[in-house]
């Protein structure tokens, strides 16, 4: 992969920086692993907006990615690496020895033709998946399960990874990129290495239209609205916020904790570092 600065042939392309990946497959994705993807445009079942700035965008198919990696002991060959419009990471198409094909999150350094395997006896090599109890302490991992057998939920985006810090009884401690240290059951699975496409965060979109292609709509400031639309709205002429920054629904926007899942608080050993 390489970062390419585009020629400033227009105002929209001036400053644009692309991530070019010549190893990615240029043809169509594997049809058997595609599903229809419907857009909610940020609305709930009542049609009310629950997530702002969503809507439009290019039509996409959902690529069914194997987050469980439960075909133990069966080697799989990497057929190709592909772009996935539904996530920041790239995906890899695996062909197992029994003929089945599955998509996985492509780890950093994975090459076409490499052989991957999952299970308790899998070697400690990038792309292989094992239960955490079989992974050496200090290993860099990604695609980590939070509940055994449920499938990977943590460290799945481009460039993401975690470090296995310790094992104590039936739980292990994992340090995430945010600085948070979590307890994870040792039967949970994780994949060796870190997620690829690590240069994704260095790209520059360049123009508003490129965000519209991705289904992201404009963000309007609260102070530019009417009082009925936002707590910061209204006033004669240009005015400040006149109160602490809040969301359109009155929730404080800075420093206010919104985590409600107290049931899993005991799984967090150390909170993430504040920016």
Swiss-Prot record:
UniProt xrefs under PROSITE patterns: RIBOSOMAL_L2
Alphabetized GO MF terms: rRNA binding; structural constituent of ribosome; transferase activity
GO biological process: cytoplasmic translation
Keyword Coiled coil: no
UniProt-recorded name of the protein: Large ribosomal subunit protein uL2
Compositionally biased spans, kind Basic and acidic residues: 229-244
Lineage summary: Bacteria, Pseudomonadati, Pseudomonadota, Betaproteobacteria, Burkholderiales
Any one GO CC term of the record: large ribosomal subunit
């Amino acid at each position: 992969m390489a970062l390419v600065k585009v020629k400033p042939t227009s105002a929209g392309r001036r400053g644009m920086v692309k991530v070019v990946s010549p190893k990615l497959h240029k043809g169509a994705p594997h049809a058997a692993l595609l599903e229809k993807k419907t857009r909610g445009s940020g609305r709930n079942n009542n049609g009310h907006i629950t997530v702002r700035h969503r809507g439009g965008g290019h039509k996409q198919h959902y690529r069914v990615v194997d987050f469980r990696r439960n075909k133990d002991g069966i080697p799989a060959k990497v057929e190709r690496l592909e772009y996935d419009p539904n996530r920041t990471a790239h995906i890899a198409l695996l062909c197992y020895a029994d003929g089945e094909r599955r998509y996985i999150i492509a780890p950093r350094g994975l090459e076409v033709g490499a052989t991957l395997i999952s299970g308790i006896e899998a070697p400690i090599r990038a792309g292989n998946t094992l239960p955490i109890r079989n992974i050496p302490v200090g290993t860099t991992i990604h695609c980590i399960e939070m509940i055994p057998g449920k499938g990977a939920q943590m460290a799945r985006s481009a460039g993401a990874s975690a470090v296995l810090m310790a094992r104590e009884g039936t739980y292990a401690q994992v340090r995430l990129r945010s600085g948070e240290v979590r307890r994870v059951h040792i039967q949970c699975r994780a994949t060796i290495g870190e997620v690829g496409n690590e240069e994704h965060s260095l790209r520059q979109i360049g123009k508003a239209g490129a965000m519209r292609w991705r289904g992201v709509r404009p963000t309007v400031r609260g102070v530019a609205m009417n009082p009925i639309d936002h707590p910061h709205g209204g006033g004669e002429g240009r005015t400040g916020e006149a109160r602490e920054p809040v969301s359109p629904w009155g929730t404080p926007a800075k420093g206010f904790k919104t985590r409600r899942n107290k049931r899993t608080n005991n799984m967090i050993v150390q909170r993430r570092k504040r920016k």
